[in-house]
């Protein structure tokens, strides 16, 4: 459970309970690398591939690609479906009030997952899965080609500057929007017990 849920369940909540704290590490931004966090979707919710591609054209330029698409800039996405790759380029100007709305994961969620595929909450929807951008794109391809999933999206990584803007505004990053490296496999945690 998240801290907020635990507070609601704990009628004697004081604020100094363990669930109010988490481990953290500090490092310079030039020592941190953020990779994309790719998406896999199990089905097209009854749509044919041709119908899905046509619906995408409302908000994206859909470009047939002869090779795997690993986006080179913000607001462009790779789509792998039916053994073919497409480059999707978002066609709208963003007039945003909060920085989290400009993130590629937010655009994908709003215009494709919610807008076309009826995936409203990526945290809980059983039809979506995630794969770190640190893994080879062939891993996505094999999951789609083996019919575990119907389609896959590759995303341009969230920048450190975007992450900082979201934090500075007091917002929360959307789920599965960043994959950080380095990961800390082992370490020493110190916790004062009174």
Indicate residue ranges for each PLM-predicted region:
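Surface-exposed, charge/polar-rich loops and edge strands
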Residues: 1-194
């Amino acid at each position: 459970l998240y801290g907020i849920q635990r507070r609601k369940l704990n009628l004697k909540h004081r604020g100094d309970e363990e669930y109010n704290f988490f481990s953290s590490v500090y490092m310079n931004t030039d020592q941190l690398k953020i990779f994309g966090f790719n998406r896999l979707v199990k089905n097209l919710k009854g749509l044919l591939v041709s119908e899905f591609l046509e619906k995408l054209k409302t908000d994206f330029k859909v470009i047939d690609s002869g090779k795997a698409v690993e986006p080179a800039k913000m607001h462009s996405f790779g789509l792998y479906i039916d053994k073919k790759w497409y480059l999707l380029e978002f066609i709208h100007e963003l007039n945003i009030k909060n920085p989290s709305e400009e993130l590629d994961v937010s655009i994908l969620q709003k215009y494709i997952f919610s807008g076309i595929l009826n995936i409203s909450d990526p945290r809980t929807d059983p039809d979506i899965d995630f794969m770190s951008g640190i893994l080879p794109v062939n891993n996505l391809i094999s999951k789609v080609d083996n019919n575990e999933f119907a389609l896959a999206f590759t995303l341009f990584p969230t920048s450190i500057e975007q992450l900082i803007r979201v934090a500075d505004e007091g917002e929360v990053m959307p789920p599965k929007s960043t994959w950080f490296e380095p990961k800390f496999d082992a370490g020493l945690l110190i916790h004062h017990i009174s």
